[in-house]
Amino acid sequence: MGQYKIWVDADACPNPIKEILFRAAERKSLPLVLVANQMLRVPPSPYISQVRVGSGFDVADQYIVNHVEPTHLVITADIPLAAQVIEKGALALNPRGELYTTDNIRQKLTMRDFMEDLRSSGVHTGGPDALSAADKQAFANSLDKWLVRV
C-alpha cells in the first residue's frame, strides 16, 4: 500500500478549495498533486506539485485514474472520474464536501446522465450554484475527517 496523497482535478476546482488544500498539505506534510491542462499558480512547497497534461477530453482525468492508489483522495466534481477512482479503491470528495461512495455513485451517475440527456434535447437545466461559505466549510470538515486517518 502506498503513502497517502491528495490528487486534485484542478482545471475546474475553485480557488478557495485549492487554498484549503494548500494549507492542509503543509500542515500534514502530505503530498498534494494538482492535475490540469494549463499551468497553475501553486505556492512553493516540497509537498505541493502540479502536473500539466495535454489538452483534450478527459486527459487530466485519465492521468489521475492511472496514478491513484487506494490510500489516496481525489478532489473532483466530475462524477465519472469519481466513479473510476472508487473502482480503484480510492476515495473521491467533491468541492462542496460530499464524499462519493460505492453506495451513492451509481445514483449520481444516473442523475448526471439524465441531466445530460435533458440538455442535449434542448432543455436549459442551469449550472450549479456558486460555492458558498457553507460549501467551503463542508469541504474543510470532510477533508479534516480524512486527514485524521493520515
From Swiss-Prot:
<dbReference type="Pfam" id="PF02639">
    <property type="entry name" value="DUF188"/>
</dbReference>
<comment type="similarity">
    <text>Belongs to the UPF0178 family.</text>
</comment>
<protein>
    <recommendedName>
        <fullName>UPF0178 protein Shewana3_1627</fullName>
    </recommendedName>
</protein>
<dbReference type="InterPro" id="IPR003791">
    <property type="entry name" value="UPF0178"/>
</dbReference>
